[in-house]
Amino acid sequence: MRPWEVAVSRRPTTAPLNQRRLVGEPCITPLHLRRSPPVRHQWGQRDRPALHTSLHQDENFHHAVFSQHQQVPLDESRQYSHSGAAPRMLHTANQPPQQSSIMVDLHEQMHQGSVPISYTVTTVTTHGFPIHTGQPIPACNAQQLPACSVMFSGQLSLLCCLPPPLIQACTMQHLPVSYQAFPPLISSEHFILHPSPAVAPHQPPPHPPHPPPPHLPPINQFVPIQPQHPRMPLQRVENEVDLRGDQHPLGTFSYPPAHHPPALTPSVPLQYLPQETLHQELPYPVPYPHMLPRRITGQRYRLQQPLPPPPPPPPYYPGFLPYFLSMLPVPPTAVGPAISLDLDVDDVEMENYEALLNLAERLGEAKPRGLTKADIEQLPSYRFNLENHQSEQTLCVVCFSDFESRQLLRVLPCNHEFHAKCVDKWLKTNRTCPICRADASEVHRDVE
């Protein structure tokens, strides 16, 4: 008899015999009154006689369950009480006899470094049983058992749908897991085993298998669960959470009649995903996007980085604007009061100079072009004679030729002399003297 079988059939010795209920008996307590108190049993020397007395009561029940196990030495109970640490037992809420939930609290103390972790899941319908993580146990048949997934409280955990008649021994095949690689097992967190309804091996299933509901993932998939509340011991949230196997079905697992899978098949290894990697990348496409809305929304906002600030405007060069304006032609309507610009003095002077030049050009075009032929002939003229010439001017400024004798010279009112042909041609287009720029017509009026 193994220690966990003894722990399953263990009852308090102080209860009367008429109030004790054997393992195989159905529970007659109403469903709304069923609740398992968070009591943890301590293993000691004073409890061992009671364990042996209750062992004979459940011998027939456990003999059928563990008939296919290999014999384990009797000193196995000593190995389960190593280091002076007592295994802890948790009780689940009472379920109907045909479908019960088993909650297991893993041992807190483990060896440092890489140790082989293997634990046994047995077919019991009682309140609870202890599980240790230091005893290697033979492997189970993977085809006889459906795949298990892990769902810890607040993190990833083990969620196992197992028909009770089909479970003989479910162990992990000596998985070497280090302390850092599996923190939920070492931090004494809880995982829940939900067995599915029992199906006889030679009877057809009660109803055809149906796909899992849309809000739950199918079997053989690992589902990351996002914690919504801080983690706390299971005893504190027992009044708020009702863990029932019939409220959390994950699908129907059945076998065809008169068909048994092979006996020895390697078990499917379980995978553990740390909490920090669940929200970064998933090992499978997410078919249920509503399960992680808050984290995905947070990543979406984190990926949107703020836009860079716009580039600053180009600097203002005060000397460029007047130069550009001076290159443009000034229209006639632009003549008027000067536009006051807050510029340098040199720029203002240059702008005024350009404006004056433009104004002079416009005024010059507006005045009369030249003298008439009658006005030109009224100017005095004479023949040049070198002997009686009294003026110091001996050169015509228009043609740059010296005066010769017997040439006709014309004298302007400013007393400047020119060749008659040269100055007449100039006066037809201009009204001023070519040397002093004096007005020839005004001087002519004064002489008259």
Swiss-Prot record:
One of its GO terms (biological process) is protein ubiquitination. CDD domains: RING-H2_RNF44. One of its GO terms (molecular function) is zinc ion binding. Pfam families: zf-RING_2 (PF13639). Keywords: Metal-binding, Zinc, Zinc-finger. A zinc finger (RING-type) spans 396-437. This is RING finger protein 44. The lineage of its organism: Eukaryota, Metazoa, Chordata, Craniata, Vertebrata. The gene is rnf44.
